[in-house]
């Protein structure tokens, strides 16, 4: 029988990790044969990292685009990303699809490439929930807590958030 950690947390108030729950269940005589992570998000969030928006200015050739400078925490110079989200602002921690990342729009796969938007270079994409498959909102980008480490893989952030929310 397979039991979801999220389902179990719905019935048991605990701060234990899945590994710790496995040990606890086994010690109670309920043998856990294996822990398995199931990929329910297409692409598994590969290529997505936490970025820190250092600057955000209005695009001179658009009434809704913004030009941002984003630190990806990789030791390289910050990158310029053009973003159309109404809620993007300097100082935010965000999820960034880096160059080469594969994202999905329904059944269509597309790759994040270096591009120009209204004459300004963009080297990635700051993501909303629906763009990475973790929700349906397209009202704006995902803004993470201020203490989220820059450069952390987005998969770790999303998994941590899901586990915290139960």
Regions found by a protein language model. Give the residues of each.
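Phosphate-backbone binding interfaces of nucleic-acid-interacting proteins
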Residues: 1-166
């Amino acid at each position: 029988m397979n039991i979801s950690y999220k389902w179990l947390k719905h019935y048991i108030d605990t701060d234990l990790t899945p590994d710790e729950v496995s040990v606890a269940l086994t010690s109670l005589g309920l043998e856990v044969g294996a822990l398995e992570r199931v990929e329910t998000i297409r692409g598994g969030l590969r290529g997505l990292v936490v970025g820190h928006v250092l600057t955000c200015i209005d695009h001179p050739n658009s009434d809704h685009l913004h030009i941002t400078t984003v630190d990806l925490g990789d030791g390289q110079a910050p990158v310029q990303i053009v973003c159309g989200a109404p809620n993007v602002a300097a100082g935010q921690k965000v999820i960034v699809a880096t160059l080469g990342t594969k994202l999905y729009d329904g059944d269509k796969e597309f790759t994040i490439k270096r591009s120009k938007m209204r004459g300004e270079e963009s080297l990635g994409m700051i993501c909303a929930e629906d763009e990475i498959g973790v929700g349906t909102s397209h009202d704006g980008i995902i803004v993470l807590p201020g203490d989220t480490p820059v450069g952390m893989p987005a998969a770790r952030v999303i998994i941590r958030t899901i586990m915290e929310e139960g």
